[in-house]
Swiss-Prot record:
Residues 1-20 form the signal peptide. GO terms for molecular function: double-stranded RNA binding; single-stranded RNA binding. This is Major royal jelly protein 3. Induction: Significantly down-regulated by the ecdysteroid 20-hydroxyecdysone (ecdysterone or 20E).
Length: 544
């Protein structure tokens, strides 16, 4: 009896230890999500570098500047310049700005870009309301000026402006025709997002989202032509007109908002703000001058998310990131996977710092606030959180931090997620840290090298018929396909034993991607990853 009691007690202790370990593991996962994005800039309220205290005081007295009316909506970066846009209201002295290294009481001071002359808008010659911006690969800054002021009242025609970032000179300005900028049926229009597809300097397509008119506008810079598309996938879903962020709710009726262009597939991803859906259109359809609007194919799913999504961006290897509204976080999905709920993961989640991610941008080799350079070729994400629920409800506490620009290395964000595994597979990244956390002692960095494992001294040249000099074992020379089945007895490393079928990274991986030789543990057609670690299960459950 005593022995049985001891056994029960011991089993109870063991189970308690296992349960405790599981809880601690989940806590660590939540902690990682909360700190995935690092704060780069933050503001209690927005202020400007007016050049002098006298100039600032005069702006306040005249009503030109009111710190309670300045709300940021977009961010982008080029070299050492971080751009921030502010929707134009009374009290907003400049809509397009750069962050300076000067500090004010509310946070870093902003300076108009390119200078104060463009901040004057009364005669419509300057920048009225630069809602969204984009930097392209030719060092050009594209600015979408909605022409709206004071809660979206029309003042000037909407327009596209293009700046040469190397000289800060305006190189082009094009007005968007009225019949393109508004819905012909409802007469409504509010241009809120853009995505730039720069094939070359004279062949660039710009896509613009009209959230109020529920349309998608296309601009071709070669001939300054505009086209407007309509689709029911642009319309808001009446089931989801109520948004709740950090316990605070508001109601709006907005259609298509966040859009993002994939550099891999040329798919344009989008969703209405008031929707749980995610859609895309293959922009290759528009390269045919004879395309017909009625024949444009739109793909996607109506209820693939469990919350509304805002800002969007796609990495160079086809990973789409979305700002989640109700979850106060960022999700990802790899476009090489089937577009379904099970394909998503959460890469960041923080109820305080990630409230309303209205903008996300990805760039390479970003100096973080001019201080740190990422390794060559790495991608870096910037995200803007602006607590839009408080903008709508007009209940800011300007003693709190309200606006943040956050950043993270893209590979770090995706580590231990489904997106990371597929991302590294397509990038040819040999970092097995994203593939199998249990294999800590294996030499995985060269696992994708099909013809050589020089670190082990075992050269596998397909065309050699008799040569296996490194291990002196000539038992089975398979001369036709160069697949030498040598045990590699010198180092006991069997990673290179079978070129056709073996997963070379550890010898213990269960997912043999035999057809394409891509040994990164994921068969893209098999969504049930047998080696998914606890972090991944924890992430994916948040979207269900």
């Amino acid at each position: 009896m005593t022995k049985w009691l001891l056994l029960v007690v011991c089993l109870g202790i063991a189970c308690q230890d296992v349960t405790s370990a599981a809880v601690n593991h989940q806590r660590k996962s939540a902690n990682n999500l909360a700190h995935s994005m690092k704060v780069i800039y933050e503001w209690k309220h927005i202020d400007f570098d007016f050049g002098s205290d006298e100039r600032r005081d005069a702006a306040i007295k005249s009503g030109e500047f009111d710190h309670t009316k300045n709300y940021p909506f977009d961010v982008d970066r080029w070299r050492d310049k971080t751009f921030v846009t502010i929707e134009r209201n009374n009290g907003v002295p400049s809509s397009l700005n750069v962050v300076t290294n000067k500090k004010g009481k509310g946070g870093p001071l902003l300076r108009p870009y390119p200078d104060w002359s463009f901040a004057k808008y009364e005669d419509c010659s300057g920048i009225v309301s630069a809602f969204k911006i984009a930097v392209d690969k030719f060092d050009r800054l594209w600015v979408l000026d909605s022409g709206l002021v004071n809660n979206n009242q029309p003042m000037c025609s909407p327009k596209l402006l293009t700046f040469d970032l190397k000289t800060s000179k305006l190189v082009k300005q094009v007005e968007i025709p009225h019949n393109i900028a508004v819905n012909a049926t409802t007469g409504m229009g509010e241009l809120v997002s853009l995505a730039v597809q720069a094939i070359d300097r004279t062949n660039t397509m710009v896509y613009i989202a009209d959230e109020k008119g529920e349309g998608l506008i296309m601009y071709q810079n070669s001939d300054d032509s505009f086209h407007r598309l309509t689709s029911n996938t642009f319309d808001y879903d009446p089931r989801y007109t109520k948004l709740t962020v950090a316990g605070e709710s508001f109601t709006v009726k907005n259609g298509i908002y966040g859009i993002a262009l994939s550099p891999v597939t040329n798919n344009l991803y989008y969703s209405p703000l008031l929707s749980h859906g995610l859609y895309y259109v293959d922009t290759e359809q528009f390269s045919n001058p004879q395309y017909e609007e009625n024949n444009v194919q739109y793909e996607g799913s109506q209820d693939i998310l469990n919350t509304q999504s805002f800002g969007k961006v796609v990495s160079k290897n086809g990973v789409l990131f979305l700002g989640l509204v109700g979850n106060s976080g960022i999700a990802c999905v790899n476009e090489h996977q089937v577009l379904q709920r099970e394909s998503f993961d959460v890469v960041a989640q923080n109820e305080e710092t990630l409230q309303m991610i209205v903008s996300m941008k990805i760039m390479e080799n970003l100096p973080q606030s001019g201080r740190i350079n990422d390794p060559e070729g790495n991608e870096y994400m910037l995200a803007l959180s602006n607590r839009m629920q408080k903008i709508i409800n007009n209940d800011f506490n300007f003693n709190d931090v309200n606006f943040r620009i956050l950043g993270a290395n893209v590979d770090d964000l995706m580590r231990n997620t489904r997106c990371g595994r597929y991302h590294n597979q397509n990038a040819g990244n040999q970092n097995a840290d994203n593939q199998n956390a249990d294999n800590q002692n294996a030499n995985n960095q060269n696992a994708d090298n099909q013809n050589a494992n020089k670190q082990n001294g075992n050269r596998q040249n397909d065309n050699r018929q008799n040569d296996n000099k490194q291990n002196g074992n000539r038992q089975n020379d398979n001369k036709q396909n160069g697949n030498r089945q040598n045990d590699n007895k010198q180092n006991g490393n069997r990673q290179n034993g079978n070129k056709q079928n073996d997963n070379k990274q550890n010898g213990n991986r269960q997912n043999d991607n035999k057809r394409n030789g891509n040994r990164q543990n994921d068969n893209q057609n098999n969504q049930n990853d047998n080696n998914r670690n606890d972090n991944q299960v924890h992430h994916s459950s948040k979207l269900h």
